[in-house]
């Protein structure tokens, strides 16, 4: 375990993330430009695909970080049976949900019920599939729909804000089931689908297209929002949410509806819109 990961056990997660949020939304020219230039240089951010390629044109660091792409920069897989990759990033893990458990790393796993905050909500995904995608600081930070779905419910599950980088994934037990997260439940033509937006250290927020800022929230109680009857339908490949810094999205699918794309494996670099799985 790295020193940084060890320190995250004792660091004041909330305070650091609140400070990161204040900096991310600062419109002071010197502050925002220093942040943009530092992150661009350190992580090799490529702005050539951005709708706004000039790093000095962004009013805040957050605007830079959640930047839109040029039209056509990402194209969905042409196969109508393809469920799409929800984001740019890297596959952390993917595979079957076995005995209700989701694989995190060697010797590490957690239950779908822990992740979703609800045994009943997890039941339809038993023996189904999961894919965990890590968005690094250099990546496009908007999350899109793998398949067309009608929003049924969101569940905010309070928790810690550990780093979700590779070393933390290997060493922090049940990491994704311990961090603060927003669970988005959708109804689709094949049944339920869940997209879980996992918060992390220095992540200053998670926003959805239907409700705005969802994370951070304060308190230690699970919060549910019922969207049944609201008619919020998001089409396949449509934007659903964005991270205000790098983090992780986990997609859950029920059993018997799809096969994962055979070219994918842990550590594979992926792009929004490529095939994640194909309907059976």
Swiss-Prot record:
Main subcellular localisation: membrane
Transmembrane regions: none
Keywords assigned by UniProt, alphabetized: Cell membrane, Decarboxylase, Lipid biosynthesis, Lipid metabolism, Lyase, Membrane, Phospholipid biosynthesis, Phospholipid metabolism, Pyruvate, Zymogen
UniProt GO MF annotations: phosphatidylserine decarboxylase activity
Intracellular or extracellular location(s): Cell membrane
Membrane topology of the entry: Peripheral membrane protein
Presence of keyword Lipid metabolism: yes
Note on cofactor: Binds 1 pyruvoyl group covalently per subunit.
Biological process according to GO: phosphatidylethanolamine biosynthetic process
Site positions per UniProt: Cleavage (non-hydrolytic): 246-247
UniProt-listed Enzyme Commission number(s): 4.1.1.65
UniProt catalytic activity: a 1,2-diacyl-sn-glycero-3-phospho-L-serine + H(+) = a 1,2-diacyl-sn-glycero-3-phosphoethanolamine + CO2
Family annotation (HAMAP family): PS_decarb_PSD_B_type1
Subunit details: Heterodimer of a large membrane-associated beta subunit and a small pyruvoyl-containing alpha subunit.
Name of this protein: Phosphatidylserine decarboxylase proenzyme
The organism of origin for this protein: Xanthomonas euvesicatoria pv. vesicatoria (strain 85-10) (Xanthomonas campestris pv. vesicatoria)
Taxonomic lineage: Bacteria, Pseudomonadati, Pseudomonadota, Gammaproteobacteria, Lysobacterales
Underlying gene: psd
């Amino acid at each position: 375990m790295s020193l940084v990961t060890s320190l995250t056990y004792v660091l004041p997660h909330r305070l650091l993330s609140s400070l990161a949020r204040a900096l991310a939304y600062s419109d002071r020219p010197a502050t925002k430009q220093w942040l943009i230039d530092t992150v661009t240089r350190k992580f090799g951010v490529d702005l050539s695909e951005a709708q706004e390629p000039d790093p000095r044109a962004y009013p805040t660091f957050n605007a830079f970080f959640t930047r839109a792409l040029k039209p056509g920069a990402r194209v969905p897989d042409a196969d109508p049976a393809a469920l799409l990759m929800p984001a740019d990033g890297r596959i952390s893990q993917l595979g079957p949900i076995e005995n209700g458990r989701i694989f995190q790393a060697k010797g590490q796993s957690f239950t779908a019920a822990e992740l979703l905050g609800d045994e009943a909500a997890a039941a339809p995904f038993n023996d189904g599939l999961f894919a965990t995608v890590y968005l690094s600081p250099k990546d496009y930070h908007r999350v899109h729909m793998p398949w067309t779905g009608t929003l049924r419910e969101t569940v905010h599950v309070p928790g810690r804000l550990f780093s979700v980088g590779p070393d933390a994934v290997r060493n922090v037990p049940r990491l994704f089931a311990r961090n603060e997260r927003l669970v988005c439940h959708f109804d689709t033509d094949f049944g339920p689908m869940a997209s879980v937006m996992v918060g992390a250290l220095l992540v200053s927020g998670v926003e959805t297209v239907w409700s705005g800022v969802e994370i951070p929230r304060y308190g230690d109680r699970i919060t549910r929002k019922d969207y049944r009857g609201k008619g919020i339908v998001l089409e396949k490949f449509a934007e659903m949410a964005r991270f205000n810094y790098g983090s992780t999205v986990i997609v859950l699918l029920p059993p018997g509806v799809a096969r994962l794309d055979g070219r994918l494996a842990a550590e594979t670099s992926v792009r929004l819109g490529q095939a994640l799985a194909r309907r059976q």
